[in-house]
Amino acid sequence: MSKGKLSERISHFNIVEELKSKGLYAYFRPIQSKQDTEVMIDGKRVLMFGSNSYLGLTIDPRIIEAAQDALSKYGTGCAGSRFLNGTLDIHIELEHKLSQLVGKEASILFSTGFQSNLGPISCLMGRNDYILLDERDHASIIDGSRLSFSKVIKYGHNDMDDLRAKLSRLPSESAKLIVTDGIFSMEGDIVNLPEMVKIADEYDAALMVDDAHSLGVIGEHGAGTASHFGLTDKVDLIMGTFSKSLASLGGFVAGDADVIDYLKHNARSVMFSASMTPASVASTLKALEIMISEPEHMENLWKNTNYAKQQLLESGFDLGATESPILPIFIRNNEKTFWVTKMLQDDGVFVNPVVSPAVPSEESLIRFSLMATHTFDQIDEAVEKMVRVFKQAEIESLI
């Protein structure tokens, strides 16, 4: 691409300036405090209902102390990839404990959750293979599929009939991989895993579940979607992240030992990326210990989720088919979604706007996410303010 063509392409990207000119830009908002149920923005108190810290562990003093201890012992970074000089004993310890949690033989760490999908999908599948994706799968799954050069086929969201129909048309001798979110990050619903494993068995397809938003939320001890349904043995690969329930940064993939060994020596996002920092690993280890040994965190998360969902539904909000602490509040208009987000922040409530192309414009929404550490009073305050702002915006469900 010539320099002129690149400049021309960039010149057409004007949505940011349009939103800023209207005072509606809602991204890259700088937070001046710890990621808690209340944060400071522009020196003002704001209720945080946009965080993925489902268990509220990012401010747990035990986790902070574990990170500080790791900094003192190992330093700030590993200065290399896992493949070469960047493997610490605590990396291996964390992999072992994650394998135990999700019920798989082995696991491999990645430096980010995004890389945890990018590496495995791109190296396990090839040009003559087929990858089947839910149309609402995460961007990292889509990008990993593109990098594999496989033939990518999307099926309707959580539509098992469509998945079966798409698989039925593929050559029986070809390699096939189904990749799905466990809990979908925008809609908050859970994959129909029982039906999916039947279809995967029927068509000899491998199955990978992205548990980024499921780990610490569902399943025994927070082990995720496969555990939630009692189908661990039927899922070939389980992916998870540490930036949500586990209060850190990074990710992993777990599966059979031979598959994980293959990934260690072929997944580029392991071989050519610096490994997780010592502080991140230690934080994850301590958060994992707390998640398993203190079930009250998950219990509180679900108490808050059920309470907030009840309050929102009784107030007339459209929540779609959510089954999780991710409560999508549908507005179904891009500009109104930005307006509501801005007005809520001005009124002391932080939520995340989700608009096209992340979702179709007629399904635009704000994502209202619960934490175990929210109080009912905080939820009540947020709902009261949302009712007022939605009525000002003339959102149809609340008029």
From Swiss-Prot:
Pfam families: Aminotran_1_2. It catalyses: L-serine + hexadecanoyl-CoA + H(+) = 3-oxosphinganine + CO2 + CoA. Keywords: Acyltransferase, Cytoplasm, Lipid metabolism, Pyridoxal phosphate, Transferase. Its main location: cytoplasm. Optimum pH is 7.0 to 8.0. InterPro entries: Aminotrans_II_pyridoxalP_BS, Aminotransferase_I/II_large, AON_synthase_class-II, PyrdxlP-dep_Trfase, PyrdxlP-dep_Trfase_major, PyrdxlP-dep_Trfase_small. GO terms for biological process: biosynthetic process; sphingolipid metabolic process. Pyridoxal 5'-phosphate binds at residues 113-114, 213, 241, 243. The modification N6-(pyridoxal phosphate)lysine is found at residue 244. One of its GO terms (molecular function) is pyridoxal phosphate binding. It is found in: Cytoplasm. GO terms for cellular component: cytoplasm; membrane. Pathway: Lipid metabolism; sphingolipid metabolism. Its EC number is 2.3.1.50. Its cofactor is pyridoxal 5'-phosphate. It is an enzyme of class 2 (transferase). The keyword Transferase applies. Catalyzes the condensation of L-serine with palmitoyl-CoA (hexadecanoyl-CoA) to produce 3-oxosphinganine. Homodimer. Belongs to the class-II pyridoxal-phosphate-dependent aminotransferase family. PANTHER family: CLASS II AMINOTRANSFERASE/8-AMINO-7-OXONONANOATE SYNTHASE, LD36009P. This is Serine palmitoyltransferase. It comes from Sphingobacterium spiritivorum.
